[in-house]
Amino acid sequence: LICFICFSPTAH
């Protein structure tokens, strides 16, 4: 999913 709040490469 695309996360606009977490800008971490591991979060995507």
Swiss-Prot record:
Main location: secreted
Protein keywords: Disulfide bond, G-protein coupled acetylcholine receptor impairing toxin, G-protein coupled receptor impairing toxin, Neurotoxin, Postsynaptic neurotoxin, Secreted, Toxin
Tissue expr: Expressed by the venom gland.
Post-translational modification: Contains 4 disulfide bonds.
Cellular location(s): Secreted
Tagged with keyword Disulfide bond: yes
Entry GO CC: extracellular region
GO molecular function terms noted in the UniProt entry: toxin activity
Known function: Probably blocks muscarinic acetylcholine receptors (CHRM), since it inhibits the binding of the selective muscarinic ligand [3H]QNB and inhibits the carbachol-induced [3H]inositol phosphate accumulation in rat hippocampus.
Protein family membership: Belongs to the three-finger toxin family.
Protein name: Muscarinic toxin Mlalpha
Organism from which the protein derives: Micrurus lemniscatus
